[in-house]
Amino acid sequence: MNVFLAPAKLNLALKITGRRSDGYHLLDSIFTFISLFDLLYIEIPPEDKLQFKSTKREINGEDNLIIQAAKALRQTTGCKKGARIFLKKMIPLGAGLGGGSSDAATALLALNHLWNLHLQRAELITLASSLGADIPFFIGAHNARVQGIGEKIRPITLPKSYYFVLYPNVTISTKTVFSFFSLLTEKNTTRIIPPLDNWPEGNDLQETTFRLYPELKQVKALLQPFGEVAMTGSGSALFIKVKDRL
């Protein structure tokens, strides 16, 4: 049995810079990896069937991103091999920590290796772009500035930092948050994150998320005495930068 780590991420800054004609929002964001992981256990059976189970029953269906990624990889390469995949879910669902995207990216990387497909990382990123906006970042395996709808990835070097991350046991629908987010309420619809030595703080989705889930605003208020509180992705996880490992 092969074991693969699927890391979580934080958005240190997230700005919405526009919207495409097809409805997809454009973003400019700083992504960083954190030491929270899902675990993928994968073995290659003699038959060509794809099998998947998880510790979270609500994601055990055929529409799971891991199965979608495996099917897309087989379709792209013509591979006929199967896989048995078990996911030990440690990253909370609907938290803005990128767990589902990371799982899919890790599956692509793992199966590319286990099936001996030898696709280059750039080819996997192209494939990942068709599956979800955050998945290409996790293929890149490096802290990055991410733009567009997630397909423009520029690796960056960040200083070593520690974060206290709180999951308030609230599951957020990213689709719902974006559907309620309106650029018409923004004073400037073409904002771009400035040079990395002068990032803005904050998250353009926070106000919308707090309106939809007002309990998160209360949680943030409780955390503020301990430092500057930020939200990752569309929520619900909040984080504070701290000086040392707790």
PLM feature spans:
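Contiguous, small/hydrophobic- and glycine-enriched helical/loop subdomains that border
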Residues: 104, 108-145
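Short beta-strand scaffold segments in enzyme catalytic cores
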Residues: 38-42, 134-138, 144-145, 238-240
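Residue-level signal for inorganic ion chemistry
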Residues: 12, 40-42, 66, 100, ...
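Short, basic/glycine-rich phosphate-binding loops at helix/coil junctions
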Residues: 46-59, 107, 129, 194-203
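Glycine/serine-rich anion-binding loops at beta->alpha junctions
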Residues: 86-115, 133, 228-242
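Conserved glycine-rich phosphate/nucleotide-binding loop
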Residues: 2-3, 244-246
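ATP-binding N-lobe of GHMP and related small-molecule kinases
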Residues: 1-95, 113, 117-122, 149, ...
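Conserved, helical-rich catalytic subdomain that frames metal- and/or nucleotide-binding sites
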Residues: 50, 138-228, 241-245
